[in-house]
Amino acid sequence: MEHRIVGPGPYRATRLWNETVELFRAKMPLRKHRCRFKSYEHCFTAAEAVDWLHELLRCSQNFGPEVTRKQTVQLLKKFLKNHVIEDIKGKWGQEDFEDNRHLYRFPPSSPLKPYPKKPPYQKDVIKFPEWNDPPPGTSQENIPVRPVVMNSEMWYKRHSIAIGEVPACRLVHRRQLTEANVEEIWKSMTLSYLQKILGLDSLEEVLDIKLVNSKFIIHNVYSVSKQGVVILDDKSKELPHWVLSAMKCLANWPNCSDLKQPMYLGFEKDVFKTIADYYGHLKEPLLTFHLFDAFVSVLGLLQKEKVAVEAFQICCLLLPPENRRKLQLLMRMMARICLNKEMPPLCDGFGTRTLMVQTFSRCILCSKDEVDLDELLAARLVTFLMDNYQEILKVPLDLQTSIEERVAHLRRVQIKYPGADMDITLSAPSFCRQISPEEFEYQRSYGSQEPLAALLEEVITDAKLSSKEKKKKLKQFQKSYPEVYQERFPTPESEALLFPEKPKPKPQLLMWALKKPFQPFQRTRSFRM
């Protein structure tokens, strides 16, 4: 009898039901039986069905050896109600199946359960808040996109280092992170981790993301005691004092210092019944209705114990703090009772471990819509929780560290240079559009050369630069972008035209300076012969 492992994913409970029904119909031994002087072919007794199906479920890795015979009978009752089987006279539709010699058979056809139909979803990538995100409330439609081809001035700023200018840097504080931003980061990264562990393309069919409260996650991480138990801000949501005292009594048995009532024979059974009654009358299971599919999906990972523990850790972070606290206290009590050798038997028909699972599985996990396998799935989950509750109900440090580093990074200052992305002003909004392969090849080949050519022309025509500075920049440009430079100056003659040789100036005649300049009306001696 081989039961395929049903992995994590949407509708896992329905997939398990269909898998079990198919295997039961295909493998259940059928033979001839007599009843009231009449023979019936291809049928089986109720007891034979219970024996065979019980062994199948116990050997299945989807359910495990903790499945009881009583649970198997409950499942066969649901088989009878859903017309998976019928009695030998063709009656079905009610859960009157009992573990006896009554005869049953398979109907000609046994329709499998259909999967719930949901509208197709678009695969949305969980988005983390970024530095440049617009403030909350800004429309996300038609957000301008940076132009693909920059103008020469922007390119000049970007590549100023290549032509010899290093601009001064400055520190820029990004937009202040609000409390809502931080909460959204916690929610987004937590769900992203869960999605990655489950190996799903989307959590939409496993979890209603809108019902996930980021405040619960943050509270469950930081508001904890030294023992790791959640501390509630609202004390009205605490366990009643009498329930907490009863749980401490059984957890510390036989040292019950909290209870002042005198002990009597069977006292521990009454205390246990009090605790079971309180948890059994909760309005909602501790793992909540809306997280049922998420926890059932994680059950498909139990073959990889470490991965399953990580997935359960994250799922338990999504719980309301009061539910997480009640679950922590309950699991600690259950584990201590099972390990306590001095504890008297709490039930004559079951062992202590089986009793814990059967008593509390439904108040821990159940479906709002009464899924047919929810009892078996809940028992499987509670068994795993009891064995690993200390790890599962701890805060996952890897996730906490990653989120804290992310928040710190967004709050950190950043070094920016003039002309970097944040300084680009868009002349007109442009939007992404699909281009042809030919246009892509052209942009890849020539898209970057046009701004460089324009930049080179600006250097050439810049009248503010001296010839020496201009030659220096052109030499650096030639070294950085030889193809563009070669296209502009294909020959040495074309380069020489840029710097024509100036004619050498003629040397000026030196005039002798007179020692004594002429004075006005100065009389001169006449020489007569």
UniProtKB/Swiss-Prot annotation:
Please name the GO terms of the biological process aspect recorded for this protein, alphabetically. cell migration; intracellular signal transduction; positive regulation of Wnt signaling pathway
SMART domains attached here?
Answer: DEP
Question: Can the keyword Phosphoprotein be found in this entry's annotation?
Answer: yes
Segments forming domain Rho-GAP: 201-393
Name the SUPFAM superfamilies for this protein.
GTPase activation domain, GAP (SSF48350), Winged helix' DNA-binding domain (SSF46785)
Give the signal peptide, or none. none
Keyword annotations of the record: GTPase activation, Phosphoprotein
Does the UniProt entry include the keyword Phosphoprotein? Answer: yes
Pfam families per the record? DEP, RhoGAP
Residue intervals of the DEP domain:
24-108
Residues with the Phosphoserine modification: S160, S436
Q: Where is this site: Arginine finger?
A: I231
GO molecular function: any one? Answer: GTPase activator activity
Q: Which InterPro entries match?
A: DEP_dom (IPR000591), Rho_GTPase_activation_prot (IPR008936), RhoGAP_dom (IPR000198), WH-like_DNA-bd_sf (IPR036388), WH_DNA-bd_sf (IPR036390)
Q: Give the protein name, as stated in the record.
A: DEP domain-containing protein 1B
Q: Which organism is it from?
A: Macaca fascicularis
Lineage, opening ranks: Eukaryota, Metazoa, Chordata, Craniata, Vertebrata
